[in-house]
Each structure stands twice: as C-alpha cells, then as structure tokens.
C-alpha cells in the first residue's frame, strides 16, 4: 500500500498527498521535516567557538547582530554529500570596502568561497559560489547582509569596511532554527470525493425507503 503520492515541486515548494495514516503520524512527519533534516549553517553561540570570525567591521551594525544575521542565511548544498561534508574544506569570506560616493548593499552575492582542500587554496568561481547562495527565484535578488556607508572623500580606504570569514557546519533544526531546511511545514485534510458520493448515495437510498 502506498502512503505517499501526487508529489508536486515548484521552485522552493514541495506538496504531496498522504493516505491511510493517522493524523498523529502525519504531524510527526511535519515535525521531522522542520527539526530532523540535516543541512548546512554558520554556528554562532555564546559560550562556544563561533564559526563566524569578524575581522573588521566599521559599519553601523555591531558584530553580535551581524553574526546572528549571517548565521540565518540558508546555504544550498547537495543533501547526498552532507554526510561526507568537511567543515574545514570551504572558507566563506567577505572582504569589501565601500570606496564609492553611494551606500553599498552587501548581499550574499558578495560572499566568496575558498577551497582549502586544494594546494594552494583556490577561490571558487562566481558560478560555483552561486550554487551555495542562490538568488530569489522570483525577484532575482540576493539576501541583504549589511549596508556600508559611502566614502566621504571618494578616496580609496576612506569608506566603511566589512571583512570576515565563516565555516559552515552540518546540524539539524533541533539545535537551532538556522539548521531547519523548511520555513513552513503544514498539512490539511482533503475532501475524499469518493466517500462523499457514497454518503450522498446512502442518504438518498435511506430517504427513498423512508418515503
């Protein structure tokens, strides 16, 4: 007997039907999707070594708030390779100075990745990096991280600076919401048209016999 059917995948949304299962089991599946599916994230917690190292930040956002914001950025990675993922292989970094006369929005598009498994280490191409941090499928925008104020003089070295490095780790949503691969996971009952027809038919026959 098949319990799952009618899978529909549309951009970042997955829908499917569940048959012949109690609601308690369906709810358990929903909770597993939220809290027990492993994914990548940047860990940063008080009292433990942080995976986010901020080397220089002259923007108006203080380091703790910035680290928290970075930790909630979703990282796309092949789920089949998660078990063998090496935390020390990839170094994610941002090194940017706003030397323009306009404010600069720093987004996930500015994150670069250094492959430390190579000798010497190499920086991944923009196309390879975009596989980790994908733009919104509708707006094509990247996630905003920070905004650097413009240079007062327009001279090099006068603008705000953001320099940091990060290391991604594998975990699950039970530890922290940053490791949850699903922002929404819900279920609802569907109308069983076959059973409805049978009910109406039985009701009709009952009324006919009653007359």
Regions found by a protein language model. Give the residues of each.
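Protein-protein interaction/assembly regions in multi-subunit complexes
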Residues: 1-211
């Amino acid at each position: 007997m098949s319990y799952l059917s009618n899978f529909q995948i549309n951009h970042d949304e997955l829908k499917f039907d569940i048959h012949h299962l109690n609601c308690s089991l369906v709810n358990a599946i929903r909770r597993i999707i939220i809290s027990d599916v492993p994914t990548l994230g940047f860990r940063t917690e008080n009292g433990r070594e942080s995976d986010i190292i901020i080397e220089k930040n002259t923007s108006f956002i203080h380091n703790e708030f910035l680290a928290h914001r970075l930790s909630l950025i979703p990282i796309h990675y092949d789920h089949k390779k998660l078990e063998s993922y090496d935390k020390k292989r990839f170094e994610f970094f941002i090194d940017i100075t706003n030397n323009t006369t306009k404010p600069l929005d720093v987004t996930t598009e500015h994150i670069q990745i250094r492959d430390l498994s190579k000798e010497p280490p190499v920086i991944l191409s923009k196309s390879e990096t975009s596989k980790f941090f994908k733009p919104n499928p509708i707006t094509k925008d990247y996630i905003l991280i920070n905004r650097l104020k413009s240079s007062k003089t327009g001279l090099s070295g006068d603008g705000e600076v953001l320099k940091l490095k990060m290391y991604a780790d594998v975990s699950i949503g039970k530890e922290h919401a940053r490791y949850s691969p699903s922002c929404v996971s819900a279920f609802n009952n569907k109308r069983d048209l076959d059973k409805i027809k049978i009910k109406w038919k039985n009701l009709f026959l009952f009324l006919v016999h009653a007359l």
